[in-house]
Amino acid sequence: MARRAADKRVNLAVSRIIPPILIGVFGYASYAITKPLCVDYLIHPAHHYDRRSRSGAGAAILAIYYVLLIPVLATYLRLLYNVVLSPGYLPRGTACTQNQTGSDGSKHRHRRHRRRKSGHHLSKTTEKTDRSDGGDVERGLEYSARAKAYPLDAEGLESFYTKDVFVCQPDGRPVYCSTCCQFKTDRAHHCREVDRCVRKMDHFCPWVGGVVSETSFKFFIQFIVYTMIYCIFVLIVFAIYTAELRREAGRTNVHWIVCLALSSLFGFFTFGVAISSVQLAANNLTTIENLNRRSAVWTLAIRVPRHILSKRWAPTFRTITYPLPPVPPAESEVARESPGGEQHVFAILQTLPGENPFDLGSPLKNIQQVMGFSLLEWLLPIKQSPCADHSSNESAFALGPVVTRLKKEAGLEVSTESESADPVGAAETPQHEQRRGKHRRRN
């Protein structure tokens, strides 16, 4: 446990240190290619080079270099902005917040107690402090045990059952994080480095200052691809002129050698990461989901259409009805009444091993969910990814042929003829959509 906490602190510290260092590397490369190479060697050669001026080559290299550097810096700054200020964290549950507040209060009481007893004998102070700590820790653990119990019915479920499809556990409830005391939205993952649940988390990357998630994965791909192109250009330029200088003068320039090494290192690194990231986007997967993609089985709660519920229906699969029944009240509590309005019935279905319900069936469509639908969105770090918009009534993320097949096999496909033949259901549908729309705006 202590080792894990130490690793977490190290990772967080490194993620704060590396971005300024990386920006410094870009600054050093800009100096090396501008002054020692283009100015002192090509445009106005120093006397010890004994060469004629090649202003055209120097100007062209500078122009291309800074044209390539601008998108690298722009995407990196946008990436840092999203990682730091819009990381895609899920809010912690009320119980977790109260637990954290209680823990802070315990620490404050302990500090006051220690100051109050500071004049006593050392052995007596130690004895009393230990006893006080034991009481505080015990109360904290007692509260944590209650807070981490899985809630039978809790606020926040509405954001799930107002959708048509959501990822659930075998009992039909959304996945629950006992650390954050919160239901996890589809594809969310708990990151141990930041101790928070993150929407569509891809990985924790110290190079970009934190967690890469649905809010930053697009800009991460743009930065990696632009940096790869930038490094290839720098590598080629310094390789050519380093070889020329060594061949004609029998020596090398230390700045050129350093930039040659850095561009080689970062070039090969970004090439591999770019290929991997584009492949993940083409398959509509995250790095975490890709770890067990060949064996993963997704459990989905899929809404049972009204026209099926209005008939005599004998399901061959498990179902769950929302809102859930009220929890039996404690002695000092009043039981919450179950909402007396519309009920939402969901079928609990599972995919086959290796199937991805979020794969849209086309690499291009999958990439568009990350990069956008126009060429400008692919090139410029301006708009957010379409997958970060969860306003659809169907699901938090776009769904693919796997879900369509599951609906068909379970007999849950919405029939237009059946809906039109059911005036009651047809009359209730707009009201249902309006109710869900109000909830979405409220969120």
From Swiss-Prot:
Autopalmitoylated. One of its GO terms (cellular component) is endoplasmic reticulum. It is an enzyme of class 2 (transferase). This is Palmitoyltransferase pfa5. It holds the Pfam family DHHC. The DHHC domain is required for palmitoyltransferase activity. Residues 124-137 have a biased composition (Basic and acidic residues). Residues 175-225 form the DHHC domain. Its EC number is 2.3.1.225. PROSITE patterns: DHHC. PANTHER family: PALMITOYLTRANSFERASE ZDHHC6, ZINC FINGER DHHC DOMAIN CONTAINING PROTEIN. The chain crosses the membrane at residues 17-37, 57-77, 220-240, 256-276. It comes from the Eukaryota.
